[in-house]
Amino acid sequence: MPVTVAPDLQAIVDRIAAEMAGREERGKVADYIPGLARVDPKHFGIAVATHDGRMFAAGDADMAFSIQSVSKVFALTIALGKVGDALWKRVGREPSGNAFNSIVQLEAEQGIPRNPFINAGAIVVSDVVLAGHAPKEAIGEILRFVRDLAGDDGIVVDDEVAQGEADTGFRNAALANYMRSFGNILHPVDQVLGVYFHQCALAMSCRQLARAGRFLMHEGQHPDTGFNIVSPMRARRINALMMLCGHYDGSGEFAFRVGIPGKSGVGGGILCVVPGIASIAVWSPGLNERGNSTLGSLALERLAAATGWSVFNQREPG
C-alpha cells in the first residue's frame, strides 16, 4: 500500500466529526460498569497521527475516556516481549465468533482462549505480565509503557472504574478460575484480575491513544526515539490479530466495512492502524449490539472511504 496522506486530511476529519455530531442513533453506553454508565453518549472525538509526525484531530479529541479492551494491545505487546512465541501455547490466534466474555469455548478447548483480545485471552496475558511482579508493579509497568509510547506522563488509571470492574466482574472471575482449573492461570486469581481491571481502566484521550499506537504504524519502532518496541514481523502479527479479532464477534463486519486493523473497547474507544501511514483513535461511548462504538465504527468507515486507506487497497489512495 503506497504511503500517502490525503492533503485535505484535517478537512476530512472535521467533516466526519460534524456528521457524527448530527447523528441521532448513537447506541447504548456500557451500563454494567458503574464508571461507564454515567458517560454522556453525545461525546465524539477523533485523532489521526500520521507517519510524518503530524496530528489531525476534531471533536472531543482531548477528553479522557476509559480505553477498556483497547489496552489489550499494549498488554499483549508487553507479554510477547517477556515470553515471545511461548505465549501462543496458552492463547490462540483465531477469531472467537462468540461474545467477548463467553465461557462456552473454554470447556471445549481445554482452557485455552481463542485469542488474546477476548476477555479470557486477555486475562492469560495479564497472568504473563504479572510474572515476577507484585500486582502494583505489573500495573505500573503497563502504565509506564503506555506513557512512553504516547510521550505523555499525564495518562492515568481511573481507580473508580477499576474498582467498579472489580465489584461487578463476576464473569471475568469465572473465566479466570475456570482457566486456572486447567492450569492456564499460574498466579492467584485475585492478583491477575487486579492487574486486568486496572489495565482496562486506563484513561486516555483520542490524541494520546493515537500517539500510543504509532509504533504499530512504524513496523514496531518508536517514532520519537527510534527504539524498536517490537520487531517488524511482530508488529505485523499484532496488526493481523487486531484485524482478525479486534472487534469481538463483529470483527468480520469491521474488516468488511473499514478494512484496517483495529481494537475496540466497551468504553467506546477504537484504535486503528494503517501500516506505514497512520495511527487513528476514535471515541464515542454509545455501543452497538456487538459492544463496539456505533459512531466510532461509522466514523472509521467514512475515514477509510475518504482517504482510500485499506490493507486491501493496492491503488494510490486519494
Curated annotation (Swiss-Prot):
Keyword annotations for this protein, in alphabetical order, are:
Hydrolase
Q: Which Gene3D superfamilies match?
A: DD-peptidase/beta-lactamase superfamily
According to its UniProt record, the EC number is: 3.5.1.2
The EC category is: hydrolase
Q: Which domain of life is it from?
A: Bacteria
Q: Which InterPro entries match?
A: Beta-lactam/transpept-like, Glutaminase
Catalytic reaction list: L-glutamine + H2O = L-glutamate + NH4(+)
Q: Provide the GO MF annotations for this entry.
A: glutaminase activity
Provide the binding site for substrate.
Answer: 69, 119, 165, 172, 196, 248, 266
Record keywords: rRNA-binding included? no
Q: Which NCBIfam families match?
A: Gln_ase, PRK00971.1-1, PRK00971.1-2
Q: How does it assemble?
A: Homotetramer.
PANTHER family linked: GLUTAMINASE
To which protein family does this belong? Belongs to the glutaminase family.
Name the UniProt record assigns to this protein: Glutaminase
Source organism per entry reads Rhizorhabdus wittichii (strain DSM 6014 / CCUG 31198 / JCM 15750 / NBRC 105917 / EY 4224 / RW1)
